């Protein structure tokens, strides 16, 4: 079991300028009908988890081949309505791509890249007679990010030592379809973005400046700390679950502050 121990806590400021049969077909050997099951998995850098996704195709011993078709969700719904499920299965075989590596009991991953919006991927299993006998679909939503501005992210001392620099130039982006969802792009390296959500709750700092509270869920920075493994970051509120530690905010000029917690899965970095 992994253990997540309260590690280093520090305040990091990111200053931005505003200018910017039920079981049949599921077991190996002797299956009478082709069967397919699909699952999706998140991808890791250098792939982009906001726009790239992986489909795992699992088939049984009666499956001779499998075909996959990726469509916009609206097109998928239209084709299902027009053709029905069986007709759509034939449509996938005719218009989709052959899943390479599928023959009999198989487990194969297929990657899709650079998607924006809502998509459906459908896989159809075909038997040795060329009959489409089973289908399964999975959905994926690719995020469109709009640039807000350029800025500089400042690391706390311990992380600056690991990064080899005190700050990094970066950009602040907002989700085109969710104005409360933000990311600081590539802050810990290519593909390692710091994402946060703007809360409705507001407050003022000691100087009377108004800000919106923000929430930073736990994520992997892609960094390692000595022999303790992968370094994770979250805000103190997300890490503890206590509102006593909610101390993150974004101002109208897009400058922001985060009460950060860095932790590892094999032990503590240091005690606060």
Spans of features found by a protein language model:
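Positively charged n-region of N-terminal signal peptides that target proteins for export
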Residues: 1-4
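Acidic/polar, low-complexity intrinsically disordered N-terminal segments immediately downstream
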Residues: 21-120, 126-161
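Ser/Thr/Gly/Pro-rich, low-complexity flexible regions
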Residues: 142-272
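C-terminal motif of bacterial Sec signal peptides marking the signal peptidase cleavage site
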Residues: 16-19
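Sec-dependent N-terminal signal peptides
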Residues: 6-12
């Amino acid at each position: 079991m992994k253990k997540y121990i309260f590690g280093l806590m520090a305040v990091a400021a990111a200053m931005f300028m505003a200018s910017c049969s039920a079981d049949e077909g599921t077991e190996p050997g002797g299956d009478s009908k082709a069967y397919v099951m699909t699952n999706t998995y998140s991808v890791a850098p250098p792939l982009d988890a906001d726009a790239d996704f992986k489909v795992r195709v699992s088939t049984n011993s009666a499956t001779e081949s499998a075909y996959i078709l990726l469509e916009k969700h609206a097109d998928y719904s239209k084709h299902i309505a027009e053709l029905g499920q069986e007709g759509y299965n034939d449509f996938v075989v005719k218009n989709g791509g052959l899943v390479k590596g599928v023959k009999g009991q198989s487990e194969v991953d297929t990657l899709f890249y650079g998607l924006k919006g809502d998509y459906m991927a459908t896989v159809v299993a075909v038997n040795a007679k060329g009959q489409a006998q089973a289908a399964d679909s999975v959905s994926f939503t690719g995020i469109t990010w709009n640039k807000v501005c350029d800025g500089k992210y400042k690391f706390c001392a311990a992380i600056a030592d690991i990064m080899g620099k005190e700050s990094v130039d970066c950009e602040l982006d907002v989700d085109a379809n969710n104005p409360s969802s933000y990311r600081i792009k590539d802050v810990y390296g290519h593909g390692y973005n710091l994402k946060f959500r703007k809360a409705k709750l507001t407050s003022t700092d000691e100087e009377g400046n108004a800000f919106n509270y923000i929430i930073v869920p736990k994520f992997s920075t892609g960094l390692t700390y000595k022999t303790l493994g992968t370094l994770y970051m979250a805000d103190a509120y997300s890490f503890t679950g206590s509102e006593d530690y909610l101390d993150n905010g974004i101002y109208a000029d897009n400058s922001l502050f985060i009460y950060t917690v860095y932790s590892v899965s094999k032990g503590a970095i240091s005690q606060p």
